[in-house]
């Protein structure tokens, strides 16, 4: 008889839940719920289990916030809870709550070639460290290492490191944003809101007044080639994505590959392919040769957060992935 566990991927707006086959890792019966409609994460889980008549003993849920102990208070939602209390209330034997990019990183060993698009570099080196990052509402970052037949995710808050410009244009952007918001982190330019910040800084640096645009407006105008400012912003976004990925590669020697997740890049895939992304990635001066062979992949799997939550739980309970 197939044994299933609950897996989840929870952001500021939606909670996506599914069942994971504990033998194969296959994800099934995924459903998305609006977080605004429920008073707690536990309430959403109960609704899902009732709707699917699911009897599970174990679960792993990825959440877009730092996980530092038993008490979890979501950064971009009102939900807050004790992991131990929720486990007890649900009658689970095992409940893991992990960072969303821990889950994405743990999905990488489970991905097949059709789930990836490569942007330069050679083949990944087996057993070497891996980096994963992705722009969405914010900028998520994690690393993954393989030690003693186990995958170990190294999550952190790498999206909040300083934005490090490396061209005259990027320097001007930094000065404009610093004057407006103070500290300028990488997330301030590499995210949905970050794309807006880039557009606004480009226009303001030219002494003009920016329009009140949303990220999708800027992307649409750039792709249609109807707004030079939007096109410059999107082009700069791609280059800075490359620079940031190259920094991750240097930091941990990620010859196992650098992986891009998140919902933004797939929206302008052809533009991204033709952009200065790889040039930015390799623009490391004396260490250009060091990063040239490191492959970069875009993850195009529908639910890497669910897949990785399942992988994390299976490994925690003793399986070798």
Swiss-Prot record:
One of its GO terms (molecular function) is ATP binding. One of its GO terms (cellular component) is cytosol. One of its GO terms (biological process) is glycolytic process. It is found in: Cytoplasm. It catalyses: D-glucose + ATP = D-glucose 6-phosphate + ADP + H(+). Its EC number is 2.7.1.2. Belongs to the bacterial glucokinase family. It is an enzyme of class 2 (transferase). Pfam families: Glucokinase. Gene3D superfamilies: 3.30.420.40, 3.40.367.20. Keywords: ATP-binding, Cytoplasm, Glycolysis, Kinase, Nucleotide-binding, Transferase. InterPro entries: ATPase_NBD, Bacterial_glucokinase, Glucokinase. It comes from the Bacteria. This is Glucokinase. HAMAP family: Glucokinase. ATP binds at residues 8-13.
């Amino acid at each position: 008889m197939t044994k299933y566990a609950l897996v989840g991927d929870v952001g500021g707006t939606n909670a996506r839940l599914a069942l994971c086959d504990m033998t194969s890792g296959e994800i099934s019966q995924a459903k998305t719920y609006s977080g605004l409609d429920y008073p707690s994460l536990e309430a959403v889980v109960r609704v899902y289990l009732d709707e699917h008549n699911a009897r599970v003993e174990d679960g792993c849920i990825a959440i877009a916030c730092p996980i530092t102990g038993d008490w979890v208070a979501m950064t971009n939602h009102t939900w807050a809870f004790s992991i131990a209390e929720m486990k007890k209330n649900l009658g689970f034997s095992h409940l893991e709550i992990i960072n969303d990019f821990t889950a994405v990183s743990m999905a990488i060993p489970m991905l097949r070639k059709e789930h990836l698009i490569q942007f330069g570099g050679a083949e990944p080196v087996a057993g070497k460290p891996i980096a994963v990052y992705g722009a969405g509402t914010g900028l998520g970052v994690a690393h993954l290492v393989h030690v003693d037949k186990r995958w170990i995710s190294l999550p952190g808050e790498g999206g909040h490191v300083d934005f490090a410009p490396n061209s005259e244009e990027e320097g001007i952007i930094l000065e404009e944003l610093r004057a407006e918001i103070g500290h300028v982190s990488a997330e301030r330019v590499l995210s949905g809101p970050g794309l807006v910040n880039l557009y606004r800084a480009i226009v303001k640096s030219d002494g003009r007044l920016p329009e009140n645009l949303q990220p999708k407006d800027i992307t649409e105008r750039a792709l249609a080639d109807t707004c030079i400012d939007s096109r410059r912003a999107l082009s700069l976004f791609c280059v800075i994505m490359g620079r940031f990925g190259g920094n991750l590669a240097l930091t941990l020697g990620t010859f196992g590959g650098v992986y891009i997740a998140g919902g933004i890049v797939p929206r302008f895939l052809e533009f991204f392919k033709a952009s200065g992304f790889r040039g930015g990635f390799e623009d490391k001066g004396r260490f250009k040769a060091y990063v040239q062979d490191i492959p970069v992949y875009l993850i195009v799997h529908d639910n890497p957060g669910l897949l990785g939550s399942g992988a994390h739980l299976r490994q925690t309970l003793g399986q070798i992935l």
